[in-house]
Amino acid sequence: MTMTDPIADMLTRLRNANSAYHDSVTMPASKIKSHIAEILQQEGFITGWKTEDAEVGKNLTLELKFGPNRERSIAGIKRISKPGLRVYAKSTNLPKVLGGLGVAIISTSHGLLTDKQAGKKGVGGEVLAYVW
């Protein structure tokens, strides 16, 4: 069975593992998922990620980050642009997540960027997800 929205699947797996206090979560790998994982690591939502060769395909493993008393570093994740309803933002109208406390992941002509990086470069694009 083919997957309609692999990004939504990644975010759902991450949200469920975070809610269950798992230390890591594994999913099928792709380039865009690796770029999203890189942004999540840069912004401090996960401790690390790696791709592994499996018997069939590749797997992406994300290491979740928790505070000293097992507080979650990810309070919420929301998929914004979906296959049935794409959402785009101009460089002058980039979204702010929780007044700048969260991160919007945006697919631009310069690759995947956060809302802050896209604002500095002056580019807009497709708003993939919000993470806070």
Swiss-Prot record:
Domain of life: Bacteria
Pfam families assigned: Ribosomal_S8 (PF00410)
GO molecular function terms attached to this record: rRNA binding; structural constituent of ribosome
One GO cellular component term noted in the UniProt record for this chain: cytosolic small ribosomal subunit
GO biological process, one term: translation
Covalent S-S links between cysteines: none
Stretches assigned to coiled coil: none
Keywords for this protein: Ribonucleoprotein, Ribosomal protein, RNA-binding, rRNA-binding
Subunit-level organization: Part of the 30S ribosomal subunit. Contacts proteins S5 and S12.
Family (UniProt): Belongs to the universal ribosomal protein uS8 family.
Biological role stated in the UniProt entry: One of the primary rRNA binding proteins, it binds directly to 16S rRNA central domain where it helps coordinate assembly of the platform of the 30S subunit.
The protein's name in its UniProt record: Small ribosomal subunit protein uS8
Organism (species): Streptomyces coelicolor (strain ATCC BAA-471 / A3(2) / M145)
Gene that encodes the chain: rpsH
